[in-house]
Amino acid sequence: ALEQLEIHAPAVIDLLHQLNDTGCCEFLCEPYSHGLSSLANEDCFREEVIRQRNKMKQMFGKEPKVFRNSSLIYSDDIGGLVASMGFKGMLTEGAKHILGWKSPHYVYHCNQAPSLKLLLRDFKLSDDISLRFSNSDWAEYPLFADKYISWIDALPQEEQVINIFMELSALGMACLLYTSPSPRDMRRS
């Protein structure tokens, strides 16, 4: 995707460099082709990850420390492999059918490599923005920052890690305007 942006949307690359220059963000690493090599071929997976890591370092001057697999696919075997490549953390899906009674709002660890921290996506809060935000048939439409923040604020106090993941393409102009007050509004009293 980075090469496509360089060719077809260099202004986006410029914006990513500006974001990088703030020192307030970290870019993730994922398989270069965004494929499913983690499920089929360990050597291919390693090559894909190394290729993407090198591209990120070449573009932004830093090696990513956190990994995001294609479609947030995770298993302890994949986690162990990711940890063996030096990553400190991994993003994955907080799927209710896997978590059961557990909450995605904690930092978990890989069973095979306990040093690898797992950050789980809150699928409902993420999808409320990425999938339902502009759906006028949705019961919560229109969604404003204060309502969204109230949902987060209503979570148990001990659940301090709220991971909202979405594709960059989900952020249209209306969504960007919606999020602008969020950092200030997110401060808990």
What residue spans do the PLM features occupy?
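A conserved active-site cap/scaffold subdomain adjacent to cofactor or substrate pockets
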Residues: E159-L177
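Conserved, mostly hydrophobic/aromatic
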Residues: E30, F67, L119
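Single conserved hydrophobic/aromatic residue that forms the stacking wall/gate
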Residues: Y178-S189
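Hydrophobic faces of well-ordered beta-strands that scaffold small-molecule active sites
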Residues: F27-C29, G89-L91, I162
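N-terminal accessory alpha/beta regions
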Residues: A1-I7
